[in-house]
Amino acid sequence: MDPKLVKELEDIVGEEYVSTRPDVLLTYSHSASTGYDGRIPGAVVRPGSTEEVAEILKVANKYKIPVTPRSGGTSLQAEAIPEEGGLVVELLRLKEITLFEDLRSVRVGAGVTFGQLDKFLNQHGLWVPVYPESSLACTVAGNVVVNGAGPGSTKYGSIAEMVMGLTVVLPTGEIIQTGSEGNPNAPGPFLRYSFGPDITGLFIGSLGMFGIITSVSLKVYKRMKHFDYNTYGFQTHEQAQRFVIEMKNNEINVLFASFYEGQILQFFMEMLGEEYGISKTDWPPYTVSVVIGHVREDIVRSDAALARELCEKLGGYVINVPELPRGEWEDRFRTFARASYAHGWHWRILYHHHTPSHWRRVIDVIWEGLDKFGLLGHTAGFATGHASFNFYPHIYFDPADKEDEG
């Protein structure tokens, strides 16, 4: 890394927040994307404000050096792995949280994790109801740039549906504010779709290519305290997918509905069954694990009764293993990471969204590929938003076996 560039970065953020030490660079060469090779950056800089990010990008432009924004480093598809010799802009110092209780919104800096935000909001009886399954380490801003989904998405959709506005530093170093906060006279974030086009949406799911998000404004809701957990079994995938559609058609307040094949559930139970307190179960060909929640207990009871009725009308039955959805929900901040690494192997993953009638065909193709090449893997998924099913196939490999990895 050019010493002149390093000196200019130090002038912006302070010497203690710039590093070219080999051990530090090695740390930032990887992320949670274990199935991908790391690349060593030339320097890491840790700004403490949006204005510092802007000045850093101006310097990067001057020296024509590639920039990789990074916060929690929990991305699963190599988004946070830097360019060789490039500059990592690490955003974890941006820790501000501002609540706008009357506007039912909150603004968080790019270094705030979902776990930190949830702890803060819990003190006010509030929450953001959509989480990734790595929330103790995943930052809100990092999840926004991949348009993440997870527990809560069956009811509320992806994290994009929670976003009210963004503070973004463009590659040129220009700072912009989207949503209602773009009006300097606005009391705070209360409207995403202000006059004109949806500029906010340009940056959601952009993987940081169009600018660096330094703060995110989100909707908040009154925290739910009443839940129903249950599992529903079906003989065909058509019955299972129809069950989820009918729950949505009947406005059942399903926060999270996961789909499992019987063989996949057995695989998961080897990893988490004992911890969740789930006894040996003969799982049906298809299981839907359901979390129903509401601020009112009577609505939860009514919705749970209707879910059972719909299940039986479709030819299914109630499995009565509430420990599975309860474990998924109560452990939602860290389930994914623990389950994925339980076997000590590395894995590659590819999230994809499908219509209710299309997902099964994709699963069949995935299984054919796994069988053809003798690979260990699985796929499961959950309903997201209005009519989308989100599936995430995993392919496991032994990191010590280069032939297996290849």
Tell where the protein language model's regions lie, with residue ranges.
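FAD-binding subdomain of flavoenzyme oxidoreductases
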Residues: 96-100, 106-110, 114-249
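Generic structural signal for well-ordered, non-membrane alpha-helical segments
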Residues: 2-6, 46, 50-53, 110, ...
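Short, well-ordered beta-strand elements within core beta-sheets of diverse protein domains
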Residues: 43-48, 219-221, 228-233, 291-292, ...
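Glycine-rich, histidine-containing beta strand-loop boundary motifs that form or position
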Residues: 69-73, 80, 91, 110, ...
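C-terminal substrate-recognition/cap domain of FAD-linked oxidoreductases
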Residues: 21-29, 241-406
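N-terminal flexible segment immediately upstream of the FAD-binding catalytic core
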Residues: 1-58, 74-104, 264-273, 325-346, ...
